[in-house]
């Protein structure tokens, strides 16, 4: 539904990684709205998982042309899957993780921060982590979901470098990839904080793309507005 506002239909295959980021972002309001009425428990995970499987099944004919891209993502995820089990973690397991588990056990409680300020939520991305905080090694999923987002952002920026006709844009996004790899290579230090930082940097690149590239201006503005809500 959203992709039609942000991409030309014939150009969607060049932005599959970015569309996955849109899915990550849309998980946030979906989880927040649900959390008004229910905790984000394993039932939420299983229901959304079944919906996703059903969507893939009904659109399976369209996925045959995406085999190469899907295979590439599967390989990347398999390579980094051990991080879920061997990563040691740090203070995030005492700072971010308790908030994530709070979302798994309770619906939104208005005014709870007046009882204990540590229960206030300044970062909505905790809701995204709460969606994936299940199954074996659940506490390490705090980092696994962050790493999936991290990989998708790097692949998205690479797509922009590959498809851009502007040298200025290629230079900026190349520098941005190096910055992200150097700055955020230890995701344990950032927990649920780095997603907003990366989106701000990425959106700045979209602003530059608006002025220096020949892409559809309206679609770029729509992307900027969309990502603005998830800083």
Task: Label each residue range with its predicted role.
Residues 30-35, 184, 220-231:
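Membrane-interface alpha helices of multi-pass inner-membrane proteins
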Residues 32-40, 86-89, 183-192:
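Membrane-interface helix caps and helix-loop-helix hairpins in membrane proteins
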Residues 55-56, 67-91, 179-181:
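Transmembrane signal-anchor helices characteristic of membrane glycosylation enzymes that use polyprenol
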Residues 11-19, 157-181:
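Transmembrane-helix signature of polytopic, membrane-embedded enzymes
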Residues 163-165, 203-221:
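Membrane-interface transmembrane helices that cradle and orient dolichyl/undecaprenyl
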Residues 1-64:
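Membrane-embedded, hydrophobic transmembrane alpha-helices
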Residues 80-169, 187-189:
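Active-site lumenal/periplasmic loops and adjacent helix-entry segments of GT-C-fold
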Residues 145-149, 173-175, 182-209:
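Multi-pass, polyprenyl lipid-linked donor-dependent membrane glycosyltransferases
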